[in-house]
A protein has these predicted regions:
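N-terminal alpha/beta PP-like core and its mobile active-site loop of ThDP/TPP-dependent enzymes
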Residues: 1-146
Length: 146
């Protein structure tokens, strides 16, 4: 049965399922709460961590042990920057990890706040692939490419 209001959160969950993701590790935050709610309703198993670095390292562990992508889900700004150590380790070891970070509204990107960070640029040197989704229609493709 098709959902009446298919949201970006629904698309993320469907893409995770289609890529055999069993677990998502992360910390709720204002920019991603809608996705946490959707995961609790109909997603891979959600495991809340106490720090974003733990989420990245737990995702790496899943990737290493199963060969399936481990997923870390965090909010924008400091949430994303706290992933870097775990992502550097996963990248250097060749472990499959998908990091999903929230982002502020587009009109807030140029404001000087701790949440308004260029996430894709920040993670470019820590990962094999880093992108920011500008168009919801490309969300599934970007996630699958990662």
């Amino acid at each position: 049965m098709a959902k009446e209001n298919y949201s970006a959160a629904d698309m993320v969950i469907d893409t995770l399922k289609n890529n055999n993701v069993d677990y998502v590790f992360g910390i709720p935050g204002a920019k991603i709460d809608y996705l946490f709610d959707a995961l609790e309703d109909d997603g891979p198993e959600l495991i809340v961590t106490r720090h974003e670095q733990n989420a990245a390292m737990m995702a790496q562990g899943v990737g290493r042990l199963t060969g399936k992508p481990g997923v870390a889900l965090v909010t924008s700004g400091p949430g994303v920057s706290n992933l870097t150590t775990g992502l550097l380790t996963a990248t250097s070891e060749g472990d499959p990890v998908l990091a999903i970070g929230g982002q502020v509204k587009r009109n807030d990107l140029l404001r000087l706040t701790h949440q308004a960070v260029d996430n894709a640029a920040l993670l470019k040197s820590s990962t094999k692939y880093s992108a920011e989704v500008q168009d919801p229609e490309s969300l599934s493709e970007v996630m699958t490419n990662a």
